[in-house]
Amino acid sequence: MTVAEDRLNAFLGRAVGDMAASVSAVLVLIGDELGLYSALAGQRLSPGELAEKTDTSERYVREWLANQAAGGYVDYDAQNDQYYLNEEQTLCLADPNGPVDLPGAYQIIRDLFHVRERAVENFRTGKGMEWGEHHPCLFEGTERFFRAGYNANLVSSWLPALDGVVEKLTAGARAADVGCGHGASTILMAQAFPTSEFVGIDYHGASIATATERAAKAGVTNAYFEAADATSYEGGDYDLIAFLDALSHCSFR
């Protein structure tokens, strides 16, 4: 066997990059859970100051910051030994109401490791997994990652792109959000169109329970949620039926 050294080195370089990305993915999740990104938004902090602000260990925080700076997830002021998030990093990592939520995407990826053993079994049997069989981090990550896009586009551009829909919703209509998950899209529409009624539908009971809690916390009274699948939900008098969270699962035959 003849091995080309240049191709070998190129392949190993890609593999090492993948391994580094895997480690960094875990550190993104840690930074999100501990509030490290939020603490860095809008201010420059030393490792000690960040640790004190987040009630964490300075030794671990210093290593976390080194990784994040090397990966371009935080910026470093070498002159003052301080770290901070620039505007773009803040938008993606520390703005819960912004148009991008990168930590949410990493939560989705995290689920793949939780279901690895089941995936191995499925490779052997050809079977699949129900949505509800996944780890809860998938449901939370999906809500966060998709909600960011809804914040930026759903009311301002997606609904207006549908002829007459905004006018109907403004006047008072009835709408269904099928496969609503934790209800982010349903709640946003209900807040934007208070004279309309919105029904969030999902077969996953735990997600429906979370959606109901989210709506109550947001003070939304014109949205409610029911557990049903896409073929058995009640009601046929809807002015709008939306598939948002569940669009990628739909069959278009």
Protein language model features and the residues they cover:
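Residue-level recognition of oxygen-bearing side chains
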Residues: 35, 45, 252
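Conserved Class I S-adenosyl-L-methionine-dependent methyltransferase catalytic core
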Residues: 2, 6, 14-33, 38-39, ...
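Short acidic, hydrophobic short linear motifs in intrinsically disordered regions
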Residues: 44-52
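Conserved adenosyl
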Residues: 112-248, 253
